[in-house]
A protein has these predicted regions:
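Non-heme Fe(II)/2-oxoglutarate
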Residues: 1-78
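Catalytic core of non-heme Fe(II) oxygenases with the double-stranded beta-helix
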Residues: 50-175
Length: 175
């Protein structure tokens, strides 16, 4: 019931088109959407990002912290706090690209929480594919190369992607 409430809420917020490539490699948006075979990378909404001071949406952040605490209790990782919360939205037209969430090797993990069951999911560079199952939280090192894959039978896929500090995290901006 709570996941459905969050999806209803996500239907009323502002979204941005995602681009999984670093700025220097991004194509102009007009190129991304041009032609009959064009695919976007999906959409996202940021509700928390500590590196840019984004505190965002209290409702979404409260839900995200609930997911964080439940996941941290069951995880073998010594999780401290969420660093970033991205909410992803994919349609069948999305073609997300390979990326890593954070390249701080061993200092952060990603939590990918599925808000509903659908035929989209997450694919890792190793070839492993995990389909979206409601209530499932995937935990993996944030430096692993992965991508989302869009649903084909369902028209939408919603999930929460968090980057989480581990106890051994060292902020690269601290001297």
């Amino acid at each position: 019931v709570l996941n459905k409430e969050v999806i209803e809420y996500l239907g009323r917020i502002d979204w941005r088109f995602a681009n999984d490539k670093p700025n220097m490699f991004q194509r102009p948006f007009t190129d991304v959407i041009a032609g009959t075979q064009a695919k976007d990378f999906g959409m996202y909404h940021t509700s928390l990002e500590d590196m840019h001071g984004t505190k965002g949406d209290p409702y979404l952040n409260t839900f995200g912290k609930w997911v964080f605490h439940l996941t941290a209790e069951k995880s073998k990782h010594a999780m401290v706090a969420p660093r970033r919360m991205y909410w992803n939205f994919y349609t069948p037209n999305a073609g997300p690209d390979w990326h890593c969430d954070e390249d701080t090797f061993g200092h952060c993990v990603s939590i990918l929480y599925n808000l509903h069951t659908n035929d989209g999911g997450t694919e890792f560079e190793t070839g492993e594919k995990v389909h979206s199952k409601e209530g499932q939280a995937l935990v993996f090192p944030s430096h692993l190369i992965h991508r989302g894959f869009a649903p084909t039978e369902f028209y939408h896929r919603f999930n929460l992607n968090m980057i989480v500090h581990l106890k051994n995290y060292k902020n690269p901006n601290d001297k």
